[in-house]
């Protein structure tokens, strides 16, 4: 059983939770917009671990991580959130408007397509059965709660079998492999990436 509540995103800088869901066997999962300055040290420690190699920021400095999330914070089409379980940070989640992202060059974007990225943070002690699925499920519930998302789109690295297994277990259907183009702009650089599309239709998506 789960219980949830959602609120509209707060003004930039307040960094209050925008979503809270009680997940049985996991705890209370909250999602809070990333504060690029305050959260950069934590995010940097996560994305530079070997286990996060598919996130693509393994060689990034803390300063670069802060700059990247400052850029995300300025955008209205891209958003980043820290997930907490009972107040403890456990994951980094990102959403984006597929029509306003490089992925739009790789497949036919439909109205209501929202892209997602997921990084579960390192666990303390023994791994908990169902933990990652519970946290990811809360995130998906949040994405669908605004009423405008008709389909959730994921594009994990094509080599990331673990991520694709998690997506399938969460109800996603795997699509074709794509080549995300390189982005080289003054404010952001993203290398080309071989990825695998995955889709999850929401209640409004049929």
Language-model features, listed with the residues they occupy:
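Conserved N-terminal entry element of GNAT/NAT acetyltransferase domains
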Residues: 1-37
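Short beta-strand or tight-loop elements
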Residues: 27, 79, 91
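Active-site rim helix/loop that mediates acceptor-substrate recognition in acyltransferases
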Residues: 59-80
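Helix-loop element at the rim of GNAT/NAT acetyltransferase active sites that forms part
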Residues: 45-59
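Primarily extracytoplasmic ectodomains and periplasmic/lumenal surface modules that are beta-strand-rich
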Residues: 37-41, 51-52
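Acyl-donor (CoA/ACP) binding surface of acyl/acetyltransferases
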Residues: 1-4, 18, 39-40, 89-206
């Amino acid at each position: 059983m789960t219980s949830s509540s959602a609120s509209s995103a707060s003004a930039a800088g307040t960094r209050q939770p925008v979503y809270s869901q009680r997940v049985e066997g996991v705890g209370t999962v909250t999602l809070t917009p990333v504060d690029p300055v305050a959260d950069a040290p934590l995010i940097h420690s996560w994305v530079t671990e070997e286990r996060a190699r598919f996130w693509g920021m393994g060689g990034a400095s803390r300063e670069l991580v802060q700059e990247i999330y400052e850029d995300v914070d300025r955008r209205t089409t891209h958003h980043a959130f820290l997930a907490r379980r009972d107040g403890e940070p456990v994951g980094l989640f990102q959403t984006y408007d597929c029509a306003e992202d490089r992925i739009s060059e790789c497949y036919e974007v439909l109205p209501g397509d929202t892209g997602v990225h997921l990084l579960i943070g390192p666990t303390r002690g023994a791994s908990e059965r169902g933990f990652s699925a519970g946290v990811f499920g809360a995130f998906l519930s949040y994405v669908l709660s605004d009423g405008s998302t008709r389909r959730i789109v994921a594009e994990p690295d094509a080599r990331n079998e673990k991520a694709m297994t998690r997506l399938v277990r969460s109800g996603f259907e795997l699509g074709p492999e794509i080549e995300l183009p390189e982005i080289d702009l003054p404010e952001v650089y993203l290398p080309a990436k071989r990825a695998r599309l995955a889709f999850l239709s929401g209640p409004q998506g049929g």
